[in-house]
Amino acid sequence: MNNLYQRDCLRLLDFTSLELQNIITLAQKLKQYKKNNKEIQLLKKKNIALIFEKESTRTRCSFEVAAFDQGAHVTYLGPGSTHLGTKESIEDTAKILGRLYDGIQYRGHHHSTIEILAKNSKVPVWNGLTEKFHPTQLLADLLTIKEIFPERKFYEIKCAYVGDAHNNMGNSLLEAASLVGLDLRLVAPKECWPEKNIFKFCKEQMKNKKGNIICTENINEGVKNVDFIYTDVWVSMGESQEVWKKRIELLSSYQVNSLMLKITNNPQVKVLHCLPALHDQKTCTVKSILKKYGFKNGMEITDEVFQKNQKIIFEQAENRLHTIKAILVSSLLKTIKF
């Protein structure tokens, strides 16, 4: 019996440490099957609803391809194409979708919405991103880290997340570290540290593990001897100009650049980025943003560092597919047989 059958994935703490690592192991196996053209379709006749209140590239494509690879069908419900929470309550929408579909993915603005969907739909619900958590991204990150260091335990791996950690990425990184024992440093000004209650809870969970979690403003302390530096965009499209200005002023000295890599004292340090990245000026939007705020060579990461690490970064992005596929298979099948 698969103990993840019919389980939701709203946040990583929905799983135990063993369950999380089993998902990573399954993702490795599914990735190998796909690479070897030996995909076994385990989800035939399954129907999946993809609710996107926020637009997406990687999350949507990963869910769709994962479902198609496994023989499932999907319905994409994009921004403005449902009555969710407007003409119809979230509860009522959840109840009807739960009768029509075997599982529901939600990507949107409010974590409370996905909690209501999960409570009322009676089918597995998966979080593609909310303002609180981004669990599917962290599953891909853990798979990427494991692929680079297959022989090392997570507690033997040091990762510094540099930039804005007061968001879904900071929260999910904390949860991931607390479950697998990753040695995690969140390197940011205090205004950009994660919520205190989440940090305190995850720190408490680490007591019986060999890893560690710290928050620090000190870049030298935070990145010294790390195996990975991880960053993300400092601001999102749609946030006000006031938010952009304040955030960029706070984080301008936390750019991931060649100097920061030297500070790690590790010539083999790897860089992760969950994308999209403001690293070059090849689009009008990014070009205007960089010019407005006085950046000549990328914002949160320089183009030089991005290009040198692009193989890992795009592998990390591809791993969204394989880990999401593992989540779908785990939650929609009573027994997993290859």
UniProtKB/Swiss-Prot annotation:
One of its GO terms (cellular component) is cytoplasm. One of its GO terms (molecular function) is amino acid binding. Keywords: Amino-acid biosynthesis, Arginine biosynthesis, Cytoplasm, Transferase. Its EC number is 2.1.3.3. It catalyses: carbamoyl phosphate + L-ornithine = L-citrulline + phosphate + H(+). Carbamoyl phosphate binds at S56, T57, R58, T59, R107, H134, P135, T136, Q137, C274, L275, R320. L-ornithine binds at N168, D232, S236, M237. InterPro entries: Asp/Orn_carbamoyltranf_P-bd, Asp/Orn_carbamoylTrfase, Asp/Orn_carbamoylTrfase_sf, Asp_carbamoyltransf_Asp/Orn-bd, Orn/put_carbamltrans, OTCase_ArgI. It is found in: Cytoplasm. It comes from the Bacteria. One of its GO terms (biological process) is arginine biosynthetic process via ornithine. Coiled coil: none annotated. Pathway: Amino-acid biosynthesis; L-arginine biosynthesis; L-arginine from L-ornithine and carbamoyl phosphate: step 1/3. It is an enzyme of class 2 (transferase). NCBIfam families: orni_carb_tr. PANTHER family: ORNITHINE CARBAMOYLTRANSFERASE SUBUNIT F-RELATED, ORNITHINE CARBAMOYLTRANSFERASE, MITOCHONDRIAL. Belongs to the aspartate/ornithine carbamoyltransferase superfamily. OTCase family. Reversibly catalyzes the transfer of the carbamoyl group from carbamoyl phosphate (CP) to the N(epsilon) atom of ornithine (ORN) to produce L-citrulline. This is Ornithine carbamoyltransferase. The lineage of its organism: Bacteria, Pseudomonadati, Pseudomonadota, Gammaproteobacteria, Enterobacterales.
